[in-house]
Amino acid sequence: MTQTEVKELLNAGVHFGHLTRKWDPNMAPYIYMERNGIHILNLYKTAAKISEAQQALKKIALSGRKILFVATKKQAKDIVAEYSKKINMPYITERWPGGMLTNFITIRKAVKKMGSIDRMKKDGTFETLSKKEKLQVDRMRSKLEKNLGSITDMTRLPGAIFIVDIKRENIAIKEAQKLNIPIFAMVDTNSDPRKVDFVIPSNDDASKSIDKVIGLIANAISEGLSERKIEKEAEMKEAEVKKDEVKEDEVKEAEVKEAEVKKAEVIKAEMKEDEVKED
């Protein structure tokens, strides 16, 4: 990151940690100093960690895997939802559904249930239900949408998860650890960074700080997605060229065979003529 970008982190208040008495000693390598009873993070280290996370997440996006964003705290949920939608990534901003990762098959069934209800409404089946049944189905659909609507496109386990506040999202952390899913996170001075694979030491309480970090991460993922699109388009063009080349070869082969058949017919005709002359 450039000097300007570090200044942007400073302006966003990314460096403000928690009260010194609430600190986790494992965050010591990322702390610059203590001021008025509050720990101040070293933004150069934060910038380096953001860069590291960006590169790794860009690769995951380029591979076609999904990155699941998790942020249920009030000051983070709207920000995370907005950026996730922009880059078409799944996110959880309501209560974490237990077994979201470790019992993914059941979660997928619940998501499919939403699809079934939507189909009922399209094909007219919904109208055959009684008033009470319609109300029950609508309530079920609303509840599913609230908790799982943001992960409908996640057809398999994510390639990584990105968390805001690992203390709050401890269940998500445990599930990801159990399945060896890489964990990226904004980690404040009151949290244990050892639980995370890619630590971004940062203020995970202020909306301005969260917005800055998530924005930088989303940009990197967006770049990965753009590169993937370009690669896919190039592959399709290459496949079309190969298809055309195969067609050309087939046409040439057919022409050669046709020429050989004609030549054989001419030779055959000449032989018949010679036989007639001899007679």
Listing of model-derived features with the role each one plays in the protein:
Residues 1-7, 223-279:
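Intrinsically disordered, compositionally biased charged tails
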Residues 90-196:
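Long, charge-patterned amphipathic alpha-helical coiled-coil/hairpin "stalk" segments used as oligomerization
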Residues 46, 72-73, 166, 189, ...:
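Short beta->alpha junction loops/turns
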Residues 41, 70, 163-165, 186, ...:
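Conserved beta-strand segments of the P-loop GTPase G domain that flank and frequently precede/overlap
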Residues 172-230:
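Short glycine/threonine-rich loop/turn motifs
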Residues 13, 69, 161, 213:
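Residue-level signature of catalytic and energy-coupling elements of molecular machines
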Residues 1-66, 72-73, 77-120, 131-134, ...:
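N-terminal cationic and glycine-rich segments that engage phosphates or anionic surfaces
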